[in-house]
Amino acid sequence: FQAKVIAGLAGYGEQKEVRNKIATICKEAFGNREFSLYSDVRIAITGALGGGDGIVVVAGTGSIALSSKNNHITRCGGWGYQLGDEGSAYWIAKRMLALYCQQFDGRLEKTQLYYLIKEKCKLENDYDIITFINKLNHDRTSIASLAKLNGIAAKDNDKYALQIYKEAAYEIAVLIKTLAKNFTSPFKVSYIGGVF
């Protein structure tokens, strides 16, 4: 009996250079063992839909939606944090941090969200937010992890936190509606990721 390695990897499959680099690393790591590589979202859609037709929306650090119809995969979104990822935890955190700055400036009233961010980021003065973000050095996972604060504020009916969630839900719904055009009969929708 010989095991086969099957891996679902973030970002695998879209760019040839990345695919080749990952394949080379896996050949070195697995030696003569047989292996197959797929994108993490391909594994997710297969698992979530049990190999059937439907749509899977993933909203974690980033966001993407995929539809599977007759074994054909179509994607929508998944453009990365610099170009899109609407509705993702990173996107939510970015909106939150912008609101923090607007609340400090006086453009918006200060709400619980403001105080949660100030406490979590250990800001002595409001301008320290710039240093805090710069120290994260564009680490999207660390920035995305701040989105939890939006959930805390939303549970207490913070109007800005609730608005961010409404906008995120709208963006995720647009991903689903775009892919729904591929179907003429009822279909399954599944969701995966920390935003949910």
Predicted region positions:
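ATP-binding/phosphotransfer module of carbohydrate and carboxylate kinases, centering on a glycine-rich
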Residues: 1-4, 25-27, 48-55, 98-196
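Polybasic, low-complexity association/targeting segments
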Residues: 5-6, 11-14
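Solvent-exposed beta-strand sheet faces enriched in polar/charged residues
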Residues: 8, 38, 190-192
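Flexible, active-site-adjacent loop/turn segments at secondary-structure boundaries
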Residues: 10, 43, 81, 131, ...
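Phosphate-binding/catalytic loop of phosphoryl-transfer enzymes
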Residues: 13-110
